[in-house]
Amino acid sequence: MTDRVPVSCETPKEPLILIVPGHHADDAPRWQQAWERKRTDCERLDLGMWDNPHRNTWVTKLNLAIDRIERPVVLVADGLATLAIAWWAEYERPAFGHPVIGALLIAPPDVDRPGLDSRVAKFGAVPRRPLPCPAFLVPDRTDPLCNYRTAYGLARDWDARFIDPEASEPDA
């Protein structure tokens, strides 16, 4: 008779998509609004303080939201919220893939460049360590704050897959 290992019949918990907008909820991109409207597995995290964002407050709100969710989390962020995720990873140093199992980061702003609005520049110098989960970074060539080459460098540093919907390689 062979030894058998009991198999759990417990169904793994479905992940929650935590949408972390980088600006006022009223100004959310259409894709975010559509996801929130059509998907039952999405929840929006309002970081607040839009007129004067505060990095550590945003990181704390993000961490508290992740801690209260009792299932795997996929973070979806755009703009300045992408940097809040990078700072969360830097400060909290979570174990790889737990509880955040993935991230989609869209149009991270280049906050390390000189002459930037001081409210946004407070999120620099951007952490450059690999993120604690698989991630995708999508630049926005139409966003004046998202420098394409900087976004490519962040993807490399964060160990995120760089996905440009318009090209397969970054511009020279």
Where are these regions (language model features)?
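Active-site catalytic motif of lipid deacylating hydrolases and related acyltransferases
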Residues: 4-6, 11-72, 167-168
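The conserved beta1-alpha1 loop
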Residues: 18-22, 78, 139
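Active-site nucleophile loop of the alpha/beta-hydrolase fold
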Residues: 22, 47-50, 103-112
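Conserved alpha/beta-hydrolase "acid-adjacent" motif
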Residues: 27, 114, 143-150
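Gly/Ala-rich beta-loop-alpha elbow adjacent to hydrolase catalytic centers
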Residues: 75-86
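Conserved hydrolase catalytic core segment
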Residues: 87-102, 111
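Short beta-strand/loop motif that positions the catalytic acidic residue
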Residues: 130-132, 136-139
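C-terminal catalytic histidine-bearing segment of alpha/beta-hydrolase fold enzymes
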Residues: 160-172
